[in-house]
């Protein structure tokens, strides 16, 4: 099927998932698979909506619900692969710690997922803390 070109401001009419560039630049995050990075971006997008809807726990932390079946369809993968992508992100499953899942309670309930802030690491060994003070510090003569 042939596709048309974009003209003028037409590209602005679409919703886009934003993928933080830090996922490709940070030493602790660049090893994530592209699908895990995309999954994090989708979850981050959902977290914005959850905040707008007031989905905060008692500590004020934003959480999301996302049906696994919907994510499987979005990423066009199977249940096993989706589990692998989640495990890459979930610190409790040996991943990088960008998400935390609280198990669902009851049949038909989705896990409560906390999408963590990549810009505010809690572990001082994370290389984000070594970020130069000035953007010009990246350049060397």
Can you name each region flagged by the protein language model?
Residues 20, 114-116:
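Residues in well-ordered beta-strands of folded domains
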Residues 23, 60, 75, 86, ...:
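Generic low-complexity, intrinsically disordered sequence content enriched
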Residues 34, 46-113:
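Winged helix-turn-helix DNA-binding recognition segment
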Residues 117-141:
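Charged low-complexity intrinsically disordered patches
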């Amino acid at each position: 099927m042939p596709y048309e070109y974009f003209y003028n401001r037409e590209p602005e009419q679409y919703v886009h998932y934003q993928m933080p560039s830090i996922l490709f630049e940070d030493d602790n995050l660049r090893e994530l698979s592209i699908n895990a990075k995309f999954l994090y971006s989708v979850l981050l997008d959902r977290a914005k909506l959850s905040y707008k809807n007031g989905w905060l726990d008692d500590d004020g932390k934003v959480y999301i619900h996302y049906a696994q079946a919907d994510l499987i369809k979005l990423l066009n993968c199977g249940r096993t692969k989706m589990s692998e992508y989640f495990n890459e992100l979930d610190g409790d499953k040996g991943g990088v710690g960008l998400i935390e899942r609280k198990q669902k309670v009851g049949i038909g309930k989705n896990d409560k997922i906390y999408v963590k802030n990549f810009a505010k690491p809690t572990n001082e060994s994370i290389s984000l803390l070594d970020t130069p003070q000035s953007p010009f510090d990246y350049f060397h003569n």
